[in-house]
A protein has these predicted regions:
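Flavin-dependent oxidoreductase catalytic cores
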Residues: 1-163
């Protein structure tokens, strides 16, 4: 596996897919390409244009665990799946928190989850306040109440918009 960004670049700039292609072309063993694979189309390009035998997804999966299914479906059919609804995103976030609590206990799980929670809400209009408030909660119930309140307000806004 090789990432198309240097250590010095860290998370800045774009992954160098030309270098990945050069390496993939030179190898006789399977090559896994990584870096800026954020959409099903980019996964396809990594396989077809770069010549990777497989694709590794990193930060694009944070708060978006469906991305792998979306990519596989696109590679198999050429069709994109519908995006997840806000309700589906929040339900999955809650499921993740429940799993973390089962694994580590609430006292450790909630602070750990707070770092992930913002990714589930990223890109949703008017979610900034909720993303910020999540950093101030310490219990599962507080997280669930905050997320439920966000969904309720989001749905109310959507109903007003769609009138």
């Amino acid at each position: 596996a090789m990432h198309g960004r240097t250590r010095k670049q860290m998370y800045m700039g774009e992954a160098d897919w030309e270098t990945l292609k050069d390496v993939a072309d030179a190898l006789t063993i399977p090559f896994v390409g990584n870096g800026d694979v954020t959409t099903p189309e980019k996964a396809k390009s990594m396989l077809e244009d770069v010549g990777a035998d497989a694709v590794m997804v990193g930060r694009a999966a944070l708060g978006n665990p469906w991305i792998i299914k979306d990519m596989v479906h696109y590679l198999d059919t050429g069709e994109k799946l519908r995006p997840q609804t806000v309700e589906e995103k929040v339900a999955t976030a809650k499921e993740q928190l429940n799993g973390l609590i089962d694994l580590k206990g609430e006292k450790i799980a909630v602070p750990e989850f707070r770092r992930q929670a913002a990714y589930y809400l990223k890109g949703i209009p008017r979610s900034a306040r909720t993303r910020a408030k999540i950093n101030d909660v310490w219990t599962k119930q507080e997280v669930f109440d905050l997320l439920d309140d966000f969904v309720e307000k989001y749905e109310a806004r959507q109903k007003q918009i769609n009138r």
